[in-house]
Amino acid sequence: MRECISIHIGQAGIQVGNACWELYCLEHGIQADGQMPGDKTIGGGDDAFNTFFSETGAGKHVPRAVFVDLEPTVIDEVRTGTYRQLFHPEQLISGKEDAANNFARGHYTIGKEIVDLCLDRIRKLADNCTGLQGFLVFNAVGGGTGSGLGSLLLERLSVDYGKKSKLGFTVYPSPQVSTSVVEPYNSVLSTHSLLEHTDVAVLLDNEAIYDICRRSLDIERPTYTNLNRLVSQVISSLTASLRFDGALNVDVNEFQTNLVPYPRIHFMLSSYAPVISAEKAYHEQLSVAEITNSAFEPSSMMAKCDPRHGKYMACCLMYRGDVVPKDVNAAVATIKTKRTIQFVDWCPTGFKCGINYQPPSVVPGGDLAKVQRAVCMISNSTSVVEVFSRIDHKFDLMYAKRAFVHWYVGEGMEEGEFSEAREDLAALEKDYEEVGAEFDEGEEGDEGDEY
């Protein structure tokens, strides 16, 4: 088997995790207590969904997941929620005091007390796998636990499981909406280790997803539940090929191979289509070409940056439902002819497509319409650099005055770590600039004539 272990860290990671496991259970027909009436091979078997669920002898399906937080409230919601019987109690790890939005507390003082326990649980899950494929790590980089403990865990996973791939789903701070004053510090410090220790990181941004919910689903005041259900559709589409049998299946390692041209350039944009409410879906024809086009719309991107300001290096389209390769090829050919969607000149093909025949499921009582087909796009675009330069700018404004730095130093960090992380991100911005401008030097003169 090619098992995947999911690790959910901090409030954002856990709440996105709840939405994901709720959706996985629906897709596979697994009940809230872990029983699966449709499963023919009780207590094992080689079903495709066993990549994400392990089975006990009594026919109970247990997610291969760990939830970690430094304070108990969010995890207690899982312990008392609808799916409380789904998870093994040992998989829900919570501490007593939180990281107080402080990277240093999550990474050094409080995080290091809990990290060995987490690794111990992860080791148990890994020993339970026959062919562990890699880890999916869910966290946010603005808070203290997601950023601090998140990067600590990633560093330790690199040591213990060097060759296994690590896919990150990371919530980055939004341009306008801020949840804490020290977000820029936490994000920069945390990205410094994401650069080193994840193989692919998908950037998510609450504001971008808010706007999608408002615009496409007509929800006036979206809640985190609305956002997370949308994010879970993206993550479900990415992992569908691991959990179901399809025509063109895509492995976790394949994302890496197809999307990452240079090891550091591994921050992805994601988008999903169709995001549409039930009232509207009834009246619209959502063909493969249409959903493919809308996945490329700048407004569909789940992070606040405009792909028209950059160039695409590679892009992965995961279709599910009633889709045939012929339609996909036609849709991709159309996209290639569009002037607004520019690829770097050293990557002429740039598309990886996957198809899965399992149609997308929706949570009953949720906002999304049940549709016949959907597409999820993960793309590597140079425009992602906008996310980093925004955070770097805010970091510089605060760090110039050394504002709030004493809270970090007091928890055992050194000022040198701030400047080291900031320099690493400056280098990353430079890397993105160079990647987008590779072979353009000689041709600057001719470009004006084309339009």
Swiss-Prot record:
Name recorded for this polypeptide: Tubulin alpha-1 chain
PTM (free text): Undergoes a tyrosination/detyrosination cycle, the cyclic removal and re-addition of a C-terminal tyrosine residue by the enzymes tubulin tyrosine carboxypeptidase (TTCP) and tubulin tyrosine ligase (TTL), respectively. Acetylation of alpha chains at Lys-40 stabilizes microtubules and affects affinity and processivity of microtubule motors. This modification has a role in multiple cellular functions, ranging from cell motility, cell cycle progression or cell differentiation to intracellular trafficking and signaling.
Entry's EC annotation: 3.6.5.-
Species per Swiss-Prot/TrEMBL record: Eleusine indica (Goosegrass)
Other noteworthy facts: Dinitroaniline herbicides (such as trifluralin and oryzalin) are antimicrotubule drugs that bind to tubulins and inhibit polymerization. Prolonged use of these chemicals has resulted in the selection of resistant (R) and intermediately resistant (I) biotypes.
Site (Involved in polymerization): Y451
Gene, per the UniProt record: TUBA1
Catalytic reaction equation(s): GTP + H2O = GDP + phosphate + H(+)
A single GO molecular function term of this UniProt record: structural constituent of cytoskeleton
